[in-house]
């Protein structure tokens, strides 16, 4: 266990960030799954812009890598256009 006040604070702040990052990542994954099971093109197109925005936010906060974000956006866009 840490002995310094700053180390204790760092442990607390890291835990808060970890919980928030996990929530945001899980929410995005659920939105991606919902998009992939969509069968209607208009519904999927509406969901796509929301999902792409969520992916961009994760990449901006370094929760996921920029290249992974690009690959996900590309795959999802191709999926929606193929409907």
UniProtKB/Swiss-Prot annotation:
* Cellular component per GO, a single term: small ribosomal subunit
**GO BP term, example:** translation
Q: Which UniProt keywords apply?
A: Ribonucleoprotein, Ribosomal protein, RNA-binding, rRNA-binding
GO-annotated molecular function: small ribosomal subunit rRNA binding; structural constituent of ribosome
Q: Which InterPro entries match?
A: Ribosomal_bS20, Ribosomal_bS20_sf
What this chain does, per the entry, is described as: Binds directly to 16S ribosomal RNA.
> What family is this protein classified in?
Belongs to the bacterial ribosomal protein bS20 family.
Recorded protein name is Small ribosomal subunit protein bS20
């Amino acid at each position: 266990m840490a002995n310094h006040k700053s180390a204790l604070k760092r442990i607390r702040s890291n835990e808060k960030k970890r919980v928030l990052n996990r929530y945001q990542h899980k929410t995005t994954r659920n939105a991606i799954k919902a998009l992939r099971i969509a069968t209607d093109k208009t519904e999927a197109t509406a969901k796509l812009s929301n999902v792409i925005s969520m992916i961009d936010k994760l990449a901006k906060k370094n929760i996921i890598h920029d290249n992974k974000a690009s690959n996900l956006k590309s795959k999802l866009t191709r999926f929606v256009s193929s409907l």
